[in-house]
UniProtKB/Swiss-Prot annotation:
Name of the molecule in the record: Energy-coupling factor transporter ATP-binding protein EcfA1
Gene that this sequence comes from: ecfA1
UniProt cross-references to NCBIfam families, sorted A to Z: ECF_ATPase_1, PRK13648.1
Keywords of the record: ATP-binding, Cell membrane, Membrane, Nucleotide-binding, Translocase, Transport
Main location: membrane
Assembly and oligomerization: Forms a stable energy-coupling factor (ECF) transporter complex composed of 2 membrane-embedded substrate-binding proteins (S component), 2 ATP-binding proteins (A component) and 2 transmembrane proteins (T component).
Length: 280
């Protein structure tokens, strides 16, 4: 049995521009994502992370190389609907993904288009809204909700399609801190409680701390790969790429440089407090 949800094999993607040289946005990427994994892809603007993510449910097809989703080649047109049913996608702006005037109708939109029976749709909509803690808002108009609530409705709309994997392309970029926290908690729960494979594209380091594994992209290539502790403890390399690290990791780095004997892989405030309390 194939343990991988998504496999990228020597993937190259070129943006073809009229009268200009084509721009390589993804440059020979090899990446396997396991079923049930929570993977974060980090990178600054223009690193290729969003372009790569759009290959993971066949929104884009590679110029060279192959992408497999649940063992299906994205270049095979007969696989497209199965792939998009298996791997849902949530974008930055929830307003661009909401199509109905009532929350529960919006969540029902995807299953209706799959031709699913009304009783089954009702069941899926209720279940999806409960999973994102938005069931009590099912009869609200989406435009009356906060940004974080709208994004959770967009996630519910994907969940109603029963995907095995959800790709989040900077889903908190347009949200305030409280909305961001709501959405990140929802993403974590979908992974931990329901076993859904999560691929989160972000530039917020505090979100990346929650991942099983982090991939860092720069100039279309994967330049680092490892656990959050392995990635963030390498502060000079992250800074060199143009990325920040979590505040507590940066503080640990500065304390080390000042001669304080403290671990370099501290990620959270609690870990920092514990480390400082153990100093003599």
């Amino acid at each position: 049995m194939n343990e991988n949800m998504i496999e990228c094999k020597n993937v190259v993607y070129k943006y073809e521009k009229a009268e200009e040289e084509s721009k390589v946005a993804v440059d020979n990427v090899n990446l396997d994502i396991k079923k049930g994994e929570f993977l974060v892809v980090l990178g600054h603007n223009g690193s290729g992370k969003s372009t790569l993510s759009k290959h993971m449910n066949a929104l884009l097809l590679p110029s060279e190389g192959t992408v497999y989703v649940s063992g299906m080649d994205t270049k095979d047109e007969s696989n497209i609907w199965k792939i998009r049913n298996n791997a849902g996608m949530v974008f930055q702006n929830p307003d661009n993904q909401l199509v109905a005037t009532i929350v529960e109708e919006d969540v029902a939109f995807g299953p209706e288009n799959l031709g699913i029976a009304p009783d089954e749709i009702r069941s899926r909509v209720d279940e999806a809204l409960k999973r994102v803690n938005m069931y009590e808002y099912r009869r609200y108009a989406p435009h009356l909700l906060s940004g974080g609530q709208k994004q959770r409705i967009a996630i519910a709309g994907i969940l109603a399609m029963r995907p095995e994997c959800i790709i989040f392309d900077e889903p908190t970029a347009m949200l305030d801190p409280s909305g961001r926290k709501e959405v990140v908690n929802t993403i974590k729960e979908l992974n931990e409680r329901y076993g859904i494979t999560i691929i989160l594209i972000t530039h917020y380091m505090e979100e990346a701390v929650e991942a099983d594994r982090i991939v860092v992209m720069d100039k279309g290539k994967i330049v680092m790969e490892g656990t959050p502790r392995e990635i963030f403890s390498n502060v000079p390399l992250m800074k060199n790429i143009g990325l920040d690290v979590p505040q507590m990791t940066e503080l640990a780095y500065e304390l080390q440089n000042s001669g304080v004997n403290i671990a370099s892989d501290i990620l959270t405030i609690d870990e920092m407090v514990n480390a400082l309390c153990q100093l003599k």
